[in-house]
């Protein structure tokens, strides 16, 4: 059967659109191809169809020379894969099909500059997508990869992560991974983290919840936020309004937008919606631990277009380990070299008041004009440097 040139739409994270579905009705090969053509044209990935099989209504395509232009990077880049396996099944819901992709173990990110090129290794990179082929939108998708690594061929810089999960459901958006590491030239370690998780979901009253956590973070720096947990919610940002923003951001990431650019786009759009609605974002809990320091707090912020930094609000924090941090940055009367670079941090630390059970309490306010006030003392004026 001659190879047939088509356009596929699966994305830089082809990792997250992949594998099985229910076989409610026998799907004809030509119908499946038409659906794929529409999906794939919509997202702009070119590929060569090498084979198409139909096994009791499950249509299986194999593609070589799959190419996707990547956006949101500092220079033009292209993802190239061979031996991509796509399956499609009909479902018991009208106009919806289950689509799956299994990625090969090897791939490439091409770029003009050698320093931007990557050799990719993807172990068990697969997942599932339910697609509404009348409206041309995903209903949900789940993707995973046991192991991902990208190598820069000349300097040998690399990044890797294990246990990647990307999930978009009507009532949940999640990205998580384990045991990630990134290096500089010649594999010089620049950072690592044992686990990271972002989770967005609706509450009982349609409020939007955002939970973030990481554990085991290591950076080559004096300050080490080894463990961080944040739980937040907003009644002023209903899930019914946040969900389309998240869906678009996830879809853009899956179809070639750099993850960093996609995160920025989602954050900006959510901030805009929160600012328009004018309701507070509650920090139900924030916990930070690292190198003998522990901090636990809660607070409330409001997104405001007129605010110098986009928000104003208040955070109440209890700190354990003030003396250790004071050894690092000093006091207003005797700052260390590091403290001299961040005088507002020195003044803020010194403004703490005795709390319960050996803690130091900080009532931190971020004002609309950019000033930071700690326990009634202005430690940062919002102007250049102090």
Task: Give the location of each predicted region.
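Bacterial N-terminal signal peptides that target proteins for export
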Residues: 1-10
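Small/flexible residues
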Residues: 6-7, 18, 176
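Small side chains
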Residues: 9-11, 21, 313
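C-terminal segment of classical bacterial N-terminal signal peptides
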Residues: 15-24
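Glycine-rich, small/hydroxylated-residue low-complexity segments
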Residues: 24-386
């Amino acid at each position: 059967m001659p190879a047939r040139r088509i356009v596929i739409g699966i994305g830089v994270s082809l990792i997250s659109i992949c594998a099985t579905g229910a076989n409610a009705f026998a799907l004809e090969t030509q119908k499946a191809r038409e659906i794929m053509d529409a999906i794939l044209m919509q997202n702009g990935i070119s590929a060569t169809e090498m084979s198409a099989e139909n096994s009791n209504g499950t249509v299986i395509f194999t593609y070589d020379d799959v190419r996707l232009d990547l956006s949101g990077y500092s220079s033009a880049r292209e993802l190239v894969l061979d031996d991509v396996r796509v399956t499609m099944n009909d479902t018991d819901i009208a106009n919806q099909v289950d689509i799956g992709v299994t990625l090969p173990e090897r791939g490439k990110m091409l770029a003009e500059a050698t320093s931007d090129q990557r050799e990719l290794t993807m172990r068990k990179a697969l997942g599932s997508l339910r697609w509404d082929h009348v409206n041309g939108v995903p209903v949900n998708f789940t993707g995973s990869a046991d192991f991902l690594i990208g190598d820069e061929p000349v300097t040998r810089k690399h990044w890797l992560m294990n246990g990647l999960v990307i999930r978009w459901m009507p009532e949940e958006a999640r990205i998580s991974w384990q045991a990630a590491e990134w290096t500089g030239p010649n594999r010089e370690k620049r950072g690592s983290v044992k686990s990271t998780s972002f989770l967005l979901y609706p509450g009982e009253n349609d409020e939007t919840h955002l939970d973030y956590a990481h554990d085991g973070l290591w950076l080559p720096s004096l300050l080490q936020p080894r463990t961080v947990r944040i739980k937040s919610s907003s009644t002023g940002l209903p899930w019914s309004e946040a969900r389309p923003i998240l869906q678009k951001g996830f879809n853009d990431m899956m179809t070639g937008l750099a993850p960093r650019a996609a995160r920025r786009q989602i954050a900006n759009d959510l901030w805009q919606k929160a600012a328009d609605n004018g309701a507070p974002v509650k920090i139900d809990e924030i916990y930070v631990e690292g190198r003998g320091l522990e901090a636990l707090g809660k607070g409330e912020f409001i997104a405001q277009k007129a605010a110098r930094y986009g928000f104003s609000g208040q955070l109440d924090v209890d700190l354990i380990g003030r003396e250790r941090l004071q050894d690092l940055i000093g006091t207003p009367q005797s700052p260390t070299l590091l403290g001299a670079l961040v005088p507002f941090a020195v003044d803020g630390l010194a403004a703490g008041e005795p709390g319960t059970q050996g803690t130091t309490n900080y009532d931190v306010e971020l004002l609309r004009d950019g000033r930071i006030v700690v326990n009634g003392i202005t430690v940062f004026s919002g102007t250049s440097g102090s």
